[in-house]
Amino acid sequence: MIDPACGTGGFLLSSYEHMKGQSHEIAKQKFLKNNTFFGADNTSLVVTMASMNLYLHDIGVDNSPIVCQDSLIDKSDRMFDVILANPPFGTRPQGSVDVSSNRPEFEKTSDNQVNFLQHIMSIVKTGGRVGIVLPDSVLTDTGATARVRRKLLDEYNLHTILKLPTGIFYAQGVKTNVLFFEKGTPTKEIWTYDYRTGIKHTLVQNPLKRSNLDEFVKLYNESTRKETYSKDNPNGRWRKYPIDEINKDESLNLSFKWIAEEDDDDKTIGEYLTEMETISADLASSVAKLKDLLEGVYDD
């Protein structure tokens, strides 16, 4: 498995902790530590920290599995069975190598998350599994982003979306999701768990805990999935969207909403501030995209 934007290696270590108890055979433990986990980051200091982090857990002792590289311009033909990633938010840093010139098969966009999604789609093996953290914009934007979504639905099985509260992975106010998909068969239906509407977490007073997602994990792992949403229970958080219904929307908007929002009169000042931060984050993202477009015009 690989994390192509691994940072200090948190996803890799969590995966190791999850897997290490599955077998006590010495050969399998050795393979797990030396031949299972790989990561990449484009900052040398971060790569060093990730390597040390794994080394302290006896992973990659002889040869670090973390490389310093820009994953978005990596043309190696290595494929992976499992990919976990939380790509950096926003646009590429100024001075970075142009992605489209190195990856002409990609839909041309300056959106970092969309490019990482395209990269991950290109390196997962047939039958391989992906879990990737992405902002709402990747589920809603038109143009190149919508075309990437079209390819994702046509060539991969995007079976599950977990909607998270704002501020969990990115800055406060940015709405995030975890997309789960497999390569090899087209999407027939998308199961969505809304752990956002009416849910509020803060880093200090009410941090997100593993137990908060117990219901999602249980529903996700059921051999026969059943919706908790129904006409009699319109606020059920687990809902299925068939591909025929999704295709009726020409924009392929995948940010599904069905749970009623609370009335404004019930909101606290802190919640209003969070909404303002959300609007500010969306505005900053739009301004960044506009700057990219204007730079392209001036370059021409």
Question: Which residues make up each language-model segment?
Answer:
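Conserved S-adenosyl-L-methionine
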Residues: 1-85, 90-92, 100-102, 110, ...
